[in-house]
Design a protein with these regions (language model features):
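A detector for small-residue-rich transmembrane helices and their helix-helix packing motifs
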Residues: 1-246
């Protein structure tokens, strides 16, 4: 199954599958807590999560998504990764993949920071003592009394997990679309082929639109945007040095 997949793409897929099986078979919340990505000001944040969150995916018994989270990400990587890896070479491909994942984390949490400031302002407008609330939320979350929607939003940001390879995978898709803009892509849910150069702006615009509407269904849409932008920028820079594309 993996013999015809270039080594970096193959190893990334294998690592994701192994991590997924280990975290689900042992069903340990500890691994999800320390390896998933948290908001940088959350008490659950650790610096390594900027990388490790890329290898974590929704539990297989999680309502609404389950194993489709990792299946969709790995199928997408399997579809676009090999051509990009062969074109860029292993070193550049690794750089693009991980910088896209890091970019997705940074943009998502930058937007979270903006949301936090909005929630602070909203609570202050109704005379909530924000300092005391945040002190309770950070130091004693299980005993924090939450009544306001803005308080719920802050709890979601500070204790919500960011996980999945989606940001890095979106970077791979964006890189592919940048280097192969006229490649015709076929999807089950689209009755006609679509060129890669058309797909890229569609997914970015759609992700921005959905992100502004909130993380619908628990999906970190701005993470997708961050990954896609990094993939596009890197591929655009490197494209100038690639004299022959197959």
């Amino acid at each position: 199954m993996f013999q015809n997949i270039p080594p970096i793409t193959r190893n990334i897929i294998i690592i994701n599958i192994v991590v997924y099986l280990v975290t689900n078979l042992f069903n340990t919340e500890f691994l999800y807590d320390i390896l998933s990505g948290y908001y940088p000001f959350s008490p659950k944040f650790h610096s390594w999560q900027i990388i490790t969150h890329m290898f974590m995916h929704a539990r297989w018994d999680e309502a609404g998504i389950g194993p489709m989270h990792i299946i969709f990400n790995m199928l997408t990587l399997w579809s676009f990764g090999p051509a990009l890896e062969q074109t860029l070479g292993e070193k550049r491909y690794v750089i693009l993949y991980f910088l896209s994942g890091i970019g997705s984390y940074l943009l998502f949490n930058l937007w979270s920071f903006v949301e936090v400031q909005q929630y602070f302002a909203e609570l202050q407008s109704v005379n909530v003592d924000v300092k005391n609330f945040m002190n309770s939320l950070i130091n004693s979350p299980n005993n924090t009394y939450i009544t306001h929607d803005a308080e719920k939003g802050l709890a979601r940001i500070y204790y919500g997990k960011m996980l999945g390879a989606s940001g890095a995978v979106f970077g791979v898709v964006a890189g592919f679309a940048t280097l192969y803009p006229n490649a015709k892509l076929v999807f089950m849910f689209i009755p006609f082929p679509i060129k890669a150069k058309i797909l890229l702006p569609i997914i970015i615009i759609a992700s921005v639109f959905l992100g502004l509407g909130g993380n619908v269904g628990g999906i970190a849409h701005f993470a997708h945007v961050g990954g896609a932008l990094v993939g596009f920028i890197l591929a655009s820079i490197w494209k100038k040095h690639l004299y022959r594309l197959n």
